[in-house]
Amino acid sequence: MGNCLYPVADDNSTKLAIKEDLLIDFPEDYYPDYNETDVEAAAPCHSCSLLNYSSLPFFILVSILGILASGTILYALLRPLFRWQLYQDRSTLVQLAVGSALFSIVVPILARGLSGALITSLCHLAHLVAYGSAFAQALLIGYHACLGPQLGAGQVPGLRLGVTVGLWGVAALLSLPVVLGSDTSQGLCTVTFSGEWETLRYIHAAACFAIFVLLPLGLLGTKGLKTVLGRAPCPWVDVLWVWFIFWWPQGMTLGLDSLVRSKAIVVSTCPAQQALDMLLDVAEALAILHCVATPLLLAWVCYQATHTSPPSLPLPTTQTSHLDTLGSKS
């Protein structure tokens, strides 16, 4: 088979060599005056994928490290000792660790180099778990930034279960386009969006752009606006926001690729198309690495929470007025 740089010669190359020997006797002025620029422009543009068959060790290594790291942080979060030491919303941190572990488990199925007779339903399930867990983690981080300390203090009883079911349900719905667009081609589990599923490509790109790009930008904008206006500290900034660094390029590149495919942006040169394909592979590799980084971020959150005092929350208006009344009486 060869590779992108050094293709292996086949029978056709021998035939071409014979034709060249036969045509060498013709005079140079026999050939018409072709424009070499037009010939190069008409040639097909071929990109060498970074995540090809040789990337299988990368997928397996990331999967093993992700499973070990996620299992370790889950064990730490579920220990009874943490129930009184951890001031953060522990259930949200546990869900983030579970999402990272689920993603780590299905990473080898998504590997380009893992060939074999994969059944289509397993491929669909792998993409559902991978993107469903990624969407859920993004929504959980946004939810934790807005309501985490309040829920940890027990000020919103009965809301935690409903929010959990709702967030994971929305994440599953957002992952349906990529699930339906995935297929087993030549024994590999890939996303093709072929045939009648072509429209789902743009829906999937829009979902990734909204969750992985617009959501963190919205959190940053809200935080900056409230800081300038001197309002409440929500959303709370913590190290979990680093998670979006791993998925933000994925949302951007998928959105750009959709614009190119829909002809909204015209890529007229082959190097530009090759650069876009390379960016897509780099963004995918960076997104895969999040399953190793997420447990480390959770470990840092736990370390900070167990070595600092619980966050101070603003008192409700009724409670503040009641305390003022007691102070005036005394």
Swiss-Prot record:
One of its GO terms (molecular function) is G protein-coupled receptor activity. Disulfide bonds join 45-270, 123-189. Glycans are attached at residues 12, 35, 52. Its main location: other. The chain crosses the membrane at residues 58-78, 90-110, 124-147, 161-181, 202-222, 239-259, 282-302. Keywords: Disulfide bond, Endosome, G-protein coupled receptor, Glycoprotein, Membrane, Receptor, Transducer, Transmembrane, Transmembrane helix. InterPro entries: Duffy_chemokine_rcpt (IPR005384). Belongs to the G-protein coupled receptor 1 family. Atypical chemokine receptor subfamily. This is Atypical chemokine receptor 1. The gene is ACKR1.
